[in-house]
């Protein structure tokens, strides 16, 4: 955690676009309920069915009913800090988040709270798409179906970006606090299917000009559309072996990730694909904190003993990457190398004595 608490507000735009907003605050207020809606958990149950689970929906909802009583560790509608609290009274950098297919806008609060406590404003967009696949579709048709959903996600993300690009909207949303967003440092983050949406959106709109972080991205649905193209931003990809094993095309997703890094030619020295030893796909979400036994039962993670390690190290690596790429400049005024991020992170990992190993992929 940084020097601030994390505030929380809900932003609702036209066409039912909802967004959880996390921001730095110094005021303690009430917490927020973890579950944003019943439909959010329907998506998770549908995902389990696609993964082969035969668990009846009533048992699923009964078993996870305790989540309705869990509260997010954030401060509901607390006032945002003034810009004088920030170093050099700078403007607030922005992070746009696209969640995984079975997830929701509140499921990355561990990350969002970390970033907000360090002075970032995070807009986590909710995507209410149908996870169930149409019957009788060929593999090509299924990929096209998922790509249509990626495009809708891009539209939702850009709708949020349109809104926050208007200074008057920001003043209204933050109660005329006088704060300013730094629209020269707009970053995008996505996990799993949200990683595909984040990368695709970054390529489509140059207003996303900060950094791109992809957490275990599933790139199959956008591969043909992004082939040979570059996000042209500092790029951090944290993948897991469990994701590679779960995809229909197996190891091809890893090759797609490596290709995305290689294509990022102008920012290759600021790009990295990596993983944490034995981490699983779900270890990048808040679920590992709230339901470790259930995760073991659903066989979504082999070892929950290292949950705290994964969360702490994921948070620190992403925070170090953002701060270094957005604010640390080399002697010529350009971006620092990704090597500096790795050195800073390894120094932290050694200091806190976390045993989980960072594996940096050799992308050639």
Model-derived regions: residue spans:
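Domain-level recognition of soluble alpha/beta enzyme cores
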Residues: 1-94, 318
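Active-site machinery of serine-nucleophile hydrolases
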Residues: 39, 46-58, 106-139, 269-273, ...
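Short substrate-entry loop that stabilizes the transition state in hydrolases
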Residues: 73-92, 97-134, 244-247
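Alpha/beta-hydrolase active-site loop
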Residues: 129-131, 137-183, 200
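Alpha/beta-hydrolase-fold serine-hydrolase catalytic core, especially in secreted/extracellular enzymes
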Residues: 278-282, 287-364
